[in-house]
Amino acid sequence: MDLNIGRMPHGSRNSIADVSGVRVGHCTVDDERHKTGVTVILPCEDDIFRNKMPAAYHVLNGFGKTAGLMQIGELGTLETPIALTNTLNVGLVHDAMVEYMCRQGERRGYAVSSVNPVVCECNDASLNDIRHRAVGQAEVFAAIAAASADFAQGDVGAGKGMTCHDLKGGIGSSSRLVEIGGETFTVGVLVLTNHGCLHDLTIGGENIGKAIEQRIREDTPDEGSCIMIVGTDLPVTSRQLGRIIRRCSVGLARLGSYIGHGSGEVMVGFSTANRIPAQGDCLNFRCIHESHIDDAFRAVAEATEEAVLRSMLEAHPVTGYTGKVRRSLGEFWQP
């Protein structure tokens, strides 16, 4: 599927997994009452706890319950995989991630006494009986075991019960290639979309949401959240990464989201280029010159816009536990 968003080239997979070492796994819970799940992003194949990554976060609108942001803000590092799930499952998924990291430490010969799992959420209660908290340790471990560079998008994992612009949302991903000083780097974005209202949906400058709205007669406030995970192999500091990930908001705005009161827009980014050992003295890091950062800004904006669209186009129609139906964008629009 070629959406032809922007002007920058994308990677071979056109996903966050174009960043070497990054893998994504899902576990979907899909039965009569539950349309939910968990998605886990593994930033590397080695030990991220003992060799951390530069990281940053940005909250555009803070109506959310994401866990793990405070330490990223203070230390500027990521030390665990990143999990995505529904709002009421954050606690159980966080506990599962702690257990996973403790087991990884034991397997590698060290004890974990403090760890900072990052667990992001959106509220899928319109389709999922969220009170049951159907995602636990077994589902988290299954998602991790299923992690691959080639992963499904749409209504899978954490995206199973999500709604985007009053249509079916979910998991989407895209990437862009950035050339600096003769070297080619990758910026990848993965989104969990659960935001926006149909009336505002705009693609390529055309407000297609109005036409779709006349056919399905549904429009609700812009609320519900969007999680944006940015992975890159650009050699950047935590501060530079923070500047880059803030441009995810451009991609959301180009599709018509105005970031409503009840919507939680959270961005988390990591770079695989520099690793930070758990113990050490003085460290030497390579980072791009600020004069070259504009291309990274454009890359993350384009990749976010495309990732959101992919989350909708790859999703199938889903009927929730109360009978509510979320239609797929693909029923009304194709690139």
Task: Name these PLM-found stretches.
Residues 1-335:
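Alpha/propeptide regions of enzymes that mature by internal proteolysis
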